[in-house]
UniProtKB/Swiss-Prot annotation:
InterPro entries: Aminoglycoside_PTrfase, Homoserine_kinase_II, Kinase-like_dom_sf, Pseudomonas-type_ThrB. One of its GO terms (molecular function) is homoserine kinase activity. This is Homoserine kinase. Its EC number is 2.7.1.39. It catalyses: L-homoserine + ATP = O-phospho-L-homoserine + ADP + H(+). Gene3D superfamilies: 3.90.1200.10, Phosphorylase Kinase, domain 1 (3.30.200.20). Pathway: Amino-acid biosynthesis; L-threonine biosynthesis; L-threonine from L-aspartate: step 4/5. GO terms for biological process: threonine biosynthetic process. Belongs to the pseudomonas-type ThrB family. Keywords: Amino-acid biosynthesis, ATP-binding, Kinase, Nucleotide-binding, Threonine biosynthesis, Transferase.
Length: 332
């Protein structure tokens, strides 16, 4: 969510003519992230987020925006795309597709506890089940084919030890993806990027018996149809780790995974390949962070993430992965 494309006051005024959102009160760029240009937008009607899509095309975008509308209609708290005056969910700004969505309440919890992981686990399972009847289909664009295409461009910049790990894990994942067990894993629309900074929490209402309340999931622009277990693995690799070492926090991981299973129990194939999928989740972000670090795009406000973080996580997952926790009952 960096700003690659600047938007002037006159640009914004022209753009807002296509919306019935009142007068603009405030507008500012969001500096975090590395994929799209995002801006907080406040009008007399409410708070919104304007996104200019730097890589996604007009042909790809309906999958993401319609998915958000679908999930919202099924009770999953996500940003709701705002239609333009012609009914479309996006238009063109500076020659690139752009959209406005509602801004969720709450703030990110960057030091989550067990209670936050429980909320995230339950809602992630609800998201997966809610997407079962979503009519559009688009693969996760940062999966195996993307890794195979981009790893060769990264290799010249890294050490021999890193190259051995990068190429060895790619071969391992290619074999896993080609297996019958992989084909049997449950799949559907996935967030694919459910990090701590893509989830908001608000204060729980008095008398509810809860300390935290999930405000919602956002930044769906890496979403795609993938194995649900991959989505769980990506989430656990961020929400349930020691940030300094990449080691799993067993208490948080256990809480998130048990909460997920109260909504959707894991299959036998998922249990067998939990280690493989945790490795896949770590590998995906190590590759993308290496690529963004060594082959960056120019941007006004760009803060590339440390690729070493997911290298440490990948090495940890190869060395140590506890089994998925068992539960006795499940409810819907």
């Amino acid at each position: 969510m960096a700003v690659f494309t600047a938007v002037s006051d006159s640009d914004l005024a022209q753009w807002m003519r296509h919306y019935e959102l009142g007068d603009v009160l405030a507008f500012r760029g969001i500096p975090s992230g590395i994929e799209n240009s995002n801006f907080f937008l406040t009008t007399t009607r409410g708070e919104y987020v304007l996104t200019i899509f730097e890589k996604l095309t007009a042909q790809q975008l309906p999958f993401y925006l319609d998915l958000m509308r679908h999930l919202a209609a099924h009770g999953v708290p996500v940003p709701d795309p705002i239609p333009r005056d012609d009914g479309a969910l996006f238009g063109e700004l500076h020659g690139k597709p752009a959209a406005i969505v509602t801004k969720l309440d709450g703030a990110a919890e960057l030091a989550p506890g067990v209670e936050h992981c429980i909320e995230v686990g339950q809602m992630l399972a609800r998201l997966h089940l809610a997407g079962r009847d979503y009519p559009r289909s688009q693969p996760n664009l940062r999966s195996l084919p993307w890794w195979q295409e981009n790893v060769p461009a990264i290799v010249p910049f890294i050490t021999d030890a890193q190259r051995t790990l990068l190429e060895g894990e790619l071969a391992h994942q290619a074999g896993f993806f080609a297996s019958d067990d992989y084909a049997a894993l449950p799949a559907g629309p996935c967030h694919c990027d459910l990090f701590r900074d893509n989830v908001l929490f608000a204060h729980a209402a008095p008398g509810t018996g809860h300390d935290v309340r999930l405000g919602g999931f956002f930044d769906f622009y890496f979403a795609g149809c993938d194995k649900w277990l991959f989505d769980v693995a990506v989430t656990v690799n961020d929400w349930c780790v020691d940030l300094a070492t990449g080691v799993l926090d067993v208490a948080r991981a256990d809480a998130l995974l048990r909460a997920y299973q109260t909504v959707r129990p894991f299959t036998a194939e998922e249990r067998r390949h939990w280690s493989d999928m945790l490795r896949a989740g770590a590998y995906r972000f190590w590759v993308s962070r290496l690529y963004d670090f060594y082959l960056p795009r120019a941007a006004e406000m760009l803060k590339p993430h440390d690729p070493g973080h997911f290298e440490r996580i990948l090495r940890e997952r190869i060395a140590h992965t506890p089994a998925l926790p068992e539960i006795q009952t499940a409810c819907n």
